[in-house]
Amino acid sequence: MATPQSVFVFAICILMITELILASKSYYDILGVPKSASERQIKKAFHKLAMKYHPDKNKSPDAEAKFREIAEAYETLSDAHRRKEYDTVGHTAFTNGKGQRGSGSPFEQSFNFNFDDLFKDFNLFGQNQNTRSKKHFENHFQTHQDGSNRQRHHFQEFSFGGGLFDDMFEDMEKMFSFSGFDTTNRHTVQTENRFHGSSKHCRTVTQRRGNMVTTYTDCSGQ
């Protein structure tokens, strides 16, 4: 027959297990989409939540943590290989690193992106907030890379292999109605910004040939 002490210990264990289950939300729950969600649904949910919880727009104390959580969920679910591995091993095993083992794993790839060009070209959060916006993205992905022991690759001309940045670049091209491809499957995006307090003009030139993108900034003073 169970004693009061054993019943109490059992109740505490059940409570702790319940709290752990509730605290460990799946990536689908974080983005608010069903497990059967399409790539388009996942992308749409991420963009909506990222704009809502971006620390430059949302001043609540937990906004930055929420934003990083959203970005991490999207980084996994937007990649077909990662999503399959995540669905196979489950959230707990995946986040503990069991879903990141094996030779040639897609999780070993490194994401390096020029955040200055991203925010300067598209000005998502206002010109005066570009630096802070860039830093929030940089800090998240640097932390995520360090935690996963990913190899860093430095390059100037790079290929978007899918995932967060390719999706954002593609959506922004459509949003701002950039010119289409010519016969060489290449297009150039040029933007010009006047910096406050100076007569200096800078333009960012982005050239894309297939999946290869090269971006540089050309500045001239008057």
Swiss-Prot record:
Biological processes annotated in GO: B cell differentiation; ERAD pathway; negative regulation of IRE1-mediated unfolded protein response; positive regulation of immunoglobulin production; response to endoplasmic reticulum stress; response to unfolded protein
Keyword Signal on entry: yes
Domain J: 26-90
Phosphoprotein as UniProt keyword: yes
Superkingdom of this protein's organism: Eukaryota
Stretch forming the signal peptide: 1-23
Protein name per its UniProtKB record: DnaJ homolog subfamily B member 9
SMART domains in the record: DnaJ
